[in-house]
Every structure is written in structure tokens, then in C-alpha cells.
Amino acid sequence: MYKRRRHILLATMFLVMSSMAWSQTASYKNPELNFEQRAADLVSRMTLEEKVSQMQNVAPAIPRLGIPAYDWWNEGLHGVARAGQATVFPQAIGLAATFDTALMHQVATAISDEARAKYNDFQRQGMHARYEGLTFWSPNINIFRDPRWGRGQETYGEDPFLTARMGIAFVQGMQGDDPKYRKLDATAKHFAVHSGPESERHRFDVHPSERDLHETYLPAFQALVQEGKVDAVMGAYNRVDGASASANPRLLQDILRKQWGFDGYTVSDCDAVEDIYKHHNIVPTAEQAAALAVKSGMDLNCGNTYAALTQAVHDGLLAESDIDHALTQLMTARFRLGMFDPPQLVPWSRLPYSVNQSPQHDALARRAADESIVLLKNNGLLPLSPDVHRIAVIGPTADDVAPLLGNYHGTPKSPVTILQGVRAAAPHAEVVYAHGADLVEGIKGGTQHPAEAREEALRAAKNADIVIFVGGLTADLEGEEMDVDYPGFAGGDRTDLRLPASQEQLLEALQATGKPVVLVLTTGSALAVDWAQQHVPAILLAWYPGQRGGTAVADALFGRTNPAGRLPITFYKADEKLPPFDDYRMEGRTYRYFKGEPLYPFGFGLSYTRFAYSDLQLDRNQAAAGDRIKVTLKVKNAGECAGDEVVQLYLQPLHEPHARVNRELRGFRRVHLQPGEEQSVSFDISPAVDLKYYDDAQHAYAVDPGSYRVQIGASSADIRLTKDFVVTPQ
């Protein structure tokens, strides 16, 4: 007891003495003051030139004020990227396919643990370069409105609601839960109407309708700001209604800050401020572009155009107070990250470097890959028998690390390719591998002549009991503004949704051998595999599944896991005439507005078991807009093996004049059920939130009184239960 009192006394004396010491020093050095006060004090002590230097992503040290050098640019889309070894989780589109927000939070927590641990180690070594910081430019919550967009793989799909829920979970996992200090900063990008074409992103001007803007392009950003409390928002390259998205007062001030109450900081996409005068030709000089961006609400410039701000102030293009306001936002963020406080005050400073690539994170990467895999077709071929004797694994993405990773990835310590996964899962089988075909015409996949590679693959298939064809895409073909020009691909985007011809031809030849074929697809976007759907007995969609992707695919093939991923995008048929890629109108796009029959609908995914739905109940069949409606139902595993089901709730307006969408996702639950097990699932509907539409006449959101339908299903096209209710007039 005496020792405990003595320790308490010493701690109290330390706090009192520290408080006295802090009161005698500069305000910005006092951790007892709030971060905004400290940031404002620090900014007030800088010269104009020093202020300007801190508003570019490469911010130099200011030794006289104790400010260390810092580079704001860091990437963490599905793992810490470009900073050495780090756990690589499935690409973002694959994480979205899990329909599992709790898992997403765990993944983001693991990413941020590794990021903070790396930062701690970099600090000990005095390192302050790019990819060594705490401000991460993820997640990408743009809407994957068109399957041709190469960066769609970075998103959470085509649906605003799913994107919002997965994005919130990611942000909260990244930023941590300490009441004072952030673990790191997440950044919602690219605000707000941005989804290709990649080759035109520095030049094109988007003119979305107000309905599309407020019902499709803005909701996820609003959710991440207001519910997720995201610390940063990144502007896009393109123009929106004539103004650069990175210098757009309506987006950055009126909507983001005034309407939504955003109190974080904004950052331009890299060299987007330069685009203002070099490519958009909005103003003629760097000084005018920099001044326009700052005055429009852009705090941080990724690039160096803000170097012109000093001259811009001297020329009267903006006031130094405009600089002060923006920089105070930025320095507040650095204080909140603990960059100016003793490490013992910042709980995240104790994260050890050993968390990187830890066994726990590796296991989580495997689980995430397991949950992301989508079973698209199964005519009873899967799961494969463990007693199979001879397996032919064929295809250009079977024994390659690239299709595991997608873009914006780190360096995994021990990645498992799909071929390696199959060999490990079938140790007693003879597993023969053949590359078989080039990824696409123009990319050579080995030393063999294409005809020789094809013949080798066919020989392997004819001698096998089962053929596993692994093909699709890699991030060498689809991604961000790439120097790519191959059949079906241009500039990072796709010009053809079909499987590359070299692969399609080999797949058809393999099927013609008469041996059972499983098609495993690696991709970050929809593939129009119409022929395979008609002829191949089993199709498994792996996405870009991360470092343990090969293990996860093999587990699904052999039934060690039961695939339960669901499509976060629509897969269109090969002959579907899509709207022009550069047309941002939502009419005819995504499951919400598409009137045709898709190859695979949004939310689709098969299982090795069967699920039965029953007993849908609403606690009221009439409600005012401000009320809440509780929805309950039961789901039962009616099959013979355990599995996950993703229960999906859609709402459909039944009345005119605003029967505007086919249906909209407004809830989902991933539940695990043993054979014969039944579980109750519940949702809450808030008409004011879940049924609102944007009223052009009122320039505001509204809820129409009238009839609506609750639809419970296993996908957007597989509705099992329905019940109607009425929203009464206010």
C-alpha cells in the first residue's frame, strides 16, 4: 500500500511539474492545449515562405521551430503499399465481395497497425521520406459505374450503400479508437465524380444531373464524413461542371464543409492543381491555379504547384490569411497524430515493428480471401474429391504472384500462388502445370512459342482427371492511367469485357477434351464469360485475392471452405451495349438502373449448401418519414454442409412519380449457419434516410408518401420474401 501511494504521489508531482513547465513554453509545444490552438500558434510563428513549404506533400523541416520533414503521401488500399514488406490483403473489390463490415474493420486495423509500426521504426532511424508517414490516401470510394474502368478494382463496387458501409468500417479501423490521438489518417477519394476514362482524367469535364450527383456520387462521401469521421478528403483530377474537382467551391466548401460539417483537411490528387492551368486551361498561370485552389478549399497540394503561392500572395491573388487557414487544418492533423508530442504520451507509438507480416495478419489475409471468393457456377463438380489422382493446372495467372496483388500493394513475405495452393491442398495427387496461353496478345508469358504452350496444356489436360484453368486479368492490364495498348485494353481501362482471346480459345480447347474443367478467374472487374457460363461446369471468381490467395482458392476448390462471396458489381453479357464510357448519367447502369438481363447480377454468389428464408415481419405497415421500421426474418441452412449466407435487404418504390430505381440495397448481414441451423436476422429501416431521393424542384432531399416494398433476397435478382408498407404524409 505504501509503495502504491508513493507511486501515485510521484506521478502527481510529475504532472504538476510538467504543467508548470509547459506553461512557460510556446503554446504549440504544450500538449495540454487542444490541437487547433497549438496548430494556430505554430502557424503564426512561420514566415510566408515557411508556410507555403508546408502545404505541399513534400514538406521540409523547419529546424528553428522543431518541425521535422514530412511527406504526406502514403498508400494503404489493401495493405501498406510501397513501404517494404507488409501483409497484402485481397484487393478492395474483393474485400467488398465479403459483404462483411466486421471483417473489413479487422483488416483495416491490421493495416493501420503495420503502418504505425513502420512509422515508429522510421522515426527511430530519422527517416521522413515518401511512404514513411501516417497520412494514408485510402479508401477509394468512387462508384464503379462502368465495368471498363481500370481503377474499379480499388473501389467497393457499384452500389452507394455497400460502398458507404464498407468504407466506414475501413476508415474506423484505420484511424483507431483512441479518444485523443489518431493512429493514422484515412483519406476518402476521389471527391466526388470520378470513374474514368483514365486517358482523359486530366482534361474531361463531368456534368452529372443533380439527381445522379446526390443519389449516386455523393452519398458514400457524406457517410464517411459524418459517420466515419474520416480525417481527409482527396479531390479528383477532372472538372465537375466546369470547375476542377480540386478547386471547386461548391464541392469543397458548400457541400463538404457547410452542408456536411467536415472539419478535416483536403488534399489534391497528385498534380491535379497543375492540371488547372496546364490541361484544363481554367487559368493561365501556376500562381493563379494555386491561389484558386486554396481559395476554393484545397488545403494540401500533392505536387509542387503550391510553390507559386508566395508570389501569388505578393501579387494579391489571395491573402496570407487564406494560407493560414489552410495550413492550420494541416498542422492540426499532424498534432492529432502525435508528431509533436513525446512518444510516451501517444499510445500508438508503442506498436512494435514485429506486427508487420505477423502470423495473425497472415491468417487474417487468408480469411479475407476465403470470404471474398464468389462461386459463379457449379454443376456438381465442386467441391473436388480429395481422392483425385491427376490434376492439370493450366493458365497464365496460375503460377504468378501478380494476379494475387492487384494495384497499390505492398511486398508480401511468402505469397502463395494458385498453383502452389492446389499442390499443397492435394499432396497425394499428381499436379501438372502448363502456362498454356499468353495473358493477352502482346504480353509474352514465357519462352515457349504460343502453339507449343497450347499443345503442352492440351496434353496435360488429356492425361488429367480434372482441369483447373486459371485465367483472367492482372494489374498489368487494368489500373491507373497506364501505358497499355493491347487488344481489349487501353490506357488502364478496358475496351472489351470478354476474356482475352488467347485465353478464351485455350479454355474452349480444354473443354473440348472432354475432361471436367473448373474455371478460376483472377480479375478486378467484371468479365463477360458467356461461353464459359454455358459450357464449363464450374466457375470460381477469386478477384486479386492477396498474399494467401492460392491457399484460399484451393480451400474453396476442395471444400475446406464454402465460398460465400457476393458480387459488388454487375457482370454484363458480352453483347450488352453499354452507355458511352464518358457519359456519367446513371441511366442504364448498375443493378439500380439497368433494364436488361445480366450475366450475373449484383449480390450474386452460389454456395455448396442451400438456404431457406421464411417469416418476414415488419413491426408496422405504415410509418411517417421520421419513424423507424423493424424488419425481421428467419434464414435456415437447408443443406448438408456449413456455410455463410449474405442476407440482402432491398427497397423498391411502388408509386409514381418517383419510381426511379429498380431496387436499392439498404441492408445486408453475413451469417454463418451449420446444417439445419436457423437464425433470426433483423434490419432497421429509416424512411427519412433509406427512401430519400433528390428533389430537383426543391434542391433538397425528400421522401415521397406512398407504397414501398421490402425485398429480402440472396441477390438483387433472387428475391425470396417481400412485404409492402406505406409512408404516410407528414
Model-identified regions with their sequence ranges:
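Bacterial N-terminal signal peptides that target proteins for export
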Residues: 1-10
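Glycoside hydrolase catalytic-domain context in secreted enzymes
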Residues: 2, 22-693, 702-716
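Bacterial N-terminal signal peptides
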Residues: 10-19
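Extracellular/periplasmic metallocenter environments
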Residues: 699
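Short beta-strand elements
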Residues: 718-730
